[in-house]
């Protein structure tokens, strides 16, 4: 397995798809990285030479990916929560922050339904 940015890239996949295993790299960015590195994106990862892998590592290194990106996203959310702005409050409460309705739906953010407790007599 090829190792790029601390992630093992699956050997059986095409280079374009394999690079998407790295957090922060999607299909579009993956293809642009392959073009910039001069590597055929339809080539399987197992068929890449060491020189190709080194070029890919160099191109991926130009972007914020994996741990650094995760840390940046977490810090952005923490900043919103510390500011106390609407989005931060919604993050803190675990509710949707982009204007979706919550009277019904929003189960992904709110979690599973709590069972209604029976009334005591």
Swiss-Prot record:
Single GO cellular component term: small ribosomal subunit
Matches recorded under Pfam families: Ribosomal_S13
InterPro entries tied to this protein: Rbsml_uS13_C, Ribosomal_uS13, Ribosomal_uS13-like_H2TH, Ribosomal_uS13_bac-type, Ribosomal_uS13_CS
Alphabetic keyword roster: Ribonucleoprotein, Ribosomal protein, RNA-binding, rRNA-binding, tRNA-binding
Domain of life the protein comes from: Bacteria
GO BP annotations, alphabetical order: translation
Region (Disordered): 92-121
UniProt signal peptide: none
GO molecular function: rRNA binding; structural constituent of ribosome; tRNA binding
Record function comment: Located at the top of the head of the 30S subunit, it contacts several helices of the 16S rRNA. In the 70S ribosome it contacts the 23S rRNA (bridge B1a) and protein L5 of the 50S subunit (bridge B1b), connecting the 2 subunits; these bridges are implicated in subunit movement. Contacts the tRNAs in the A and P-sites.
Similarity comment: family membership: Belongs to the universal ribosomal protein uS13 family.
Listed PANTHER family: 30S RIBOSOMAL PROTEIN S13/40S RIBOSOMAL PROTEIN S18, SMALL RIBOSOMAL SUBUNIT PROTEIN US13M
Subunit note: Part of the 30S ribosomal subunit. Forms a loose heterodimer with protein S19. Forms two bridges to the 50S subunit in the 70S ribosome.
Name this protein carries in UniProt: Small ribosomal subunit protein uS13
Classification of source organism: Bacteria, Pseudomonadati, Pseudomonadota, Betaproteobacteria, Burkholderiales
